[in-house]
């Protein structure tokens, strides 16, 4: 009984935790349990803000929650494998690449302001995403093989039509080969990761509570 009280008390505190924003009360609550860990509504809100910042839009809450469950799986496997955190210089390079996706430094700052993320939040979340993607890359890239036929097909169906749409001269196949190969490798990594995540998730105890007692 004492052990049960010790376990339940922290959960009770989490369930009734309240943050005040302006005149509104936002109740932070448990929205999922994965094995012995929990995911909070505030975790959904934070990842959604990062999506808004990095991509210009965020997914619905249920999709964000599923991403958080997937991230739990990847992070747990990476930790078990003692996979190293990204180096500071790798985080800086990733941040520089992200900044280049914006038309100007002003647009970057404006989007960050709209998302409500602080500089520290942004770097922390970027580092977390980089850690997960690095692990998936290391896990699946060695087994992926891309043949010449796949490269030529991608060139004919994706590269050439896209250039023509923009009224540009398409690059030669040879000059685009490395870019195409990496694009196909990334697509294959995503496919293998999706398959692995579905298989891994089926073996875990996952409970979703997002739509229960919603405000």
In which residue ranges do the predicted regions lie?
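Bacterial N-terminal signal peptides
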Residues: 8-17
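Residues in and immediately flanking transmembrane alpha helices
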Residues: 16-19, 48, 56, 194-195, ...
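Peptidyl-prolyl cis-trans isomerase
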Residues: 26-27, 33, 58-215
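N-terminal targeting signals for Sec/Tat export/insertion, comprising classic cleavable signal peptides
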Residues: 30-60
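Boundary at the C-terminal end of the N-terminal hydrophobic targeting segment
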Residues: 20-25
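Bacterial N-terminal signal peptides that target proteins for export
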Residues: 1-9
